[in-house]
């Protein structure tokens, strides 16, 4: 039974010369293939804007990569990581300012999205931002470590990359 139209994962709007890209999957804002493709398409759609704001849903900026895809096997995980890196690079190298409006929790690849942005602003609340991979003994990919070195103050860098907080 169909419950009606499905809301899009990503919506875009313009507020004068600023484009706003909103990501909302109705849950944790996990980055699966559909979400990554939708965000990449949204960046294509707003190329004429003077600046771009990327926002998540209330209380959930992004929980990172979709763990169902990551658990589907090494090929599926590699494919998702490759497209994720395409998104990270698109944001990091974007020719105009990208502002992340952190609307809630930003974990793992969600935190990397924040670091790919030129500026980050956050909602007030008891939200977590971090790289939990390192808390379970996983090492960060080199690009994530270098991105953190570029975007996080020295004071917070070690804590973020060694402790995940």
Regions found by a protein language model. Name each.
Residues 1-57, 89:
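Conserved CoA-thioester-binding segment of acyl-CoA-metabolizing enzymes
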Residues 37-38, 56-89, 106, 135:
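Glycine- (often His-adjacent) and acidic-residue-rich active-site loop
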Residues 4-5, 90-165:
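Crotonase-fold acyl-CoA enzyme core
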Residues 21, 54, 66, 113-115:
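Hydrophobic/aromatic residues within transmembrane alpha-helices
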Residues 46-50, 72-75, 94-96:
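Short glycine/proline-enriched coil/turn segments at helix->beta-strand junctions
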Residues 25-28, 68, 127:
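A short, flexible beta-alpha/helix-coil linker loop
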């Amino acid at each position: 039974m169909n419950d009606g139209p499905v809301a899009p994962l990503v919506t875009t709007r313009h507020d004068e010369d600023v484009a706003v890209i909103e990501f909302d999957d109705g849950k944790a804002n996990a980055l699966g293939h559909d979400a990554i493709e939708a965000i990449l398409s949204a960046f294509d759609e707003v190329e004429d804007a003077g600046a771009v704001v990327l926002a998540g849903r209330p209380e959930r900026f992004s929980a990172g990569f979709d763990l169902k895809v990551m658990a589907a096997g090494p090929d599926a995980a590699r494919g998702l990581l490759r497209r994720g890196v395409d998104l990270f690079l698109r944001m990091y190298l974007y020719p105009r300012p990208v502002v992340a409006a952190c609307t809630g929790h930003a974990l793992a690849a969600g935190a990397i999205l924040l670091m790919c942005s030129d500026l980050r602003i956050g909602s007030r609340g008891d939200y977590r931002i971090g790289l939990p991979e390192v808390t379970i003994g996983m090492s960060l990919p080199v690009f994530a470590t270098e991105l953190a070195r570029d975007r996080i103050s020295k004071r917070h860098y070690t804590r973020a990359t060694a402790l995940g907080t």
